[in-house]
A protein has these predicted regions:
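A conserved beta-strand-loop-helix scaffold within acyl/acetyltransferase catalytic domains
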Residues: 2-69, 125-264
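Short, high-confidence coil segments that cap the C-terminus of an alpha-helix
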Residues: 40-42, 114-117, 284
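Aromatic (often tryptophan-rich) hydrophobic motifs at membrane interfaces
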Residues: 46, 216-329
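Conserved acyl-donor/pantetheine-binding loop and adjacent beta-alpha core of acyl/acetyltransferases
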Residues: 61-87
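Active-site/acyl-donor-binding loops of N-acyltransferases
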Residues: 62-64, 127, 136-157, 284-357
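A short, internal acetyl-CoA/4′-phosphopantetheine-binding micro-motif in the GNAT/acyltransferase core
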Residues: 86-96, 153-154, 256-265, 293
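Non-catalytic accessory segments adjacent to catalytic cores
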Residues: 99-144
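Short catalytic-loop micro-motif centered on adjacent basic/acidic residues
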Residues: 121, 182, 286-290
């Protein structure tokens, strides 16, 4: 088995992605953008043995924000998925070989440890990881809720029938009130989308990590082949907006929201259904709406379930690649917060040393 950790400009990265069924989150240009935003090094792991391949992108982060970035004489890192649903990719041959899949993941852990990483946290892709759990021992993945997708292979009538009655009423009401939904170039509407998104994050009191700067939106706007923008207007005034990714038959809702003054009219209902119609007309298979905040079964998930009964299990992968360093950082976190180590290590957050306390 050949294994390698790829840097962002390595031509083997796009070559590997082209050979595997993938999504926008696996492309080097997206991982690079997310790495810059998070001040982390964008990388990917590739394992190959004949036709069997395993690929996963990741961000390599220094642990300096947790205190001194060294444990002993060595600098300490950890690994996390880019924002969204990157997850493992497996070739067809790899999906038929539990032995290959397990050995590849063992080599991933070994090589990350050699690079100084003490842990890794990966978010799986709900639509691309079917059957993965059977390849590994029980408990290898951690269940993290469900996500919602609209099946765009349905005919127009069946697609509409899958929408909850209350959502149907809201969509028809928006149209009757004169709201118009259209796809627009993100490059020409960056300021508008940013304003609506920030208004939405302020309203829901989102964590700081959900706020993205202008450069982030502008960089997305420079990827028009995969990145699209939907806008709902009322008499020419922007009411709701959302950025979508399109790749390999999957359309992903990324960042969006509703302007507060239009909230009572719920124009985002119209936006999502209109995008489903647009994506279906372009021959895509799924519009993936995602799940609740942090995978929770919350109001956001219930809202999304109103557009489709189709649910996919969402899971994460948690690896401790260096037990000693992991324990040391966890102890430091507990000491800094003046709480018992057990309050950090048993709290369910991973990695424990980054738990919000």
């Amino acid at each position: 088995m050949d294994v390698v950790h790829l840097e962002i400009d390595d031509p083997r990265w796009p070559d590997a992605v082209r050979r595997l069924r993938h999504d926008f989150y696996h492309l080097p240009e997206y991982v690079s953008l997310d790495g810059e935003w998070n001040r982390a090094q964008p990388m990917a792991f590739l394992a190959r043995s004949g036709d069997a391949e395993l690929f996963i992108p990741y961000l390599l982060r220094r642990c300096e924000s947790l205190g001194p970035a060294e444990v002993g004489d060595a600098e300490v890192y950890d690994v996390v998925s880019p924002y969204g649903y990157p997850g493992l990719l497996l070739s067809d041959a790899a999906r038929r070989s539990p032995r290959f899949a397990r050995e590849a993941m063992h080599r991933l852990s070994e090589t990350l440890r050699a690079m100084g990483a003490c842990s890794a946290f990966f978010r799986m892709h709900p639509l691309l990881s079917d059957g993965f759990a059977e390849l590994f021992s029980p408990g290898f993945f951690t269940a993290a809720g469900e996500t919602v997708a609209m099946d765009l292979t349905l005919d127009e009538g069946a697609l509409w029938k899958g929408v909850r009655e209350g959502h149907q009423w809201t969509i028809k009401k928006c149209r009757k009130l004169g709201f118009v939904s259209r796809m627009v170039p993100l490059r020409e509407h960056v300021e508008c989308v940013m304003e609506i998104y920030r208004d939405t994050m302020d309203r829901v009191q989102a964590k700081e990590s959900y706020y993205f700067g202008r450069e982030y939106f502008a960089r997305l706007a420079g990827m028009p082949g995969h990145v699209h923008c939907a806008l709902v207007e009322s008499e020419g005034r922007p009411a709701a907006a959302c950025i979508f990714f399109e790749c390999g038959g999957i359309v992903q809702a990324h960042l969006g929201g509703t302007r507060s003054e239009f909230l009572s009219k719920s124009p985002f209902h119209l936006l999502l259904y209109s995008v489903a119609e647009w994506a279906r007309a372009r021959g895509n298979r799924y519009l993936h709406l995602g799940g609740g905040v942090g995978g929770a079964s919350d109001r956001l998930l219930q809202f999304k379930r109103g557009f489709s009964p189709l649910l996919f299990p969402f899971s994460t992968l948690r690896l401790v690649t260096d037990e000693r360093k992991y324990r040391e950082l966890t102890t430091r976190r507990a000491q800094a917060a003046d709480v018992p180590v057990e309050a950090v290590s048993c709290g369910g957050f991973f990695p424990a040393y980054r738990a919000p306390l």
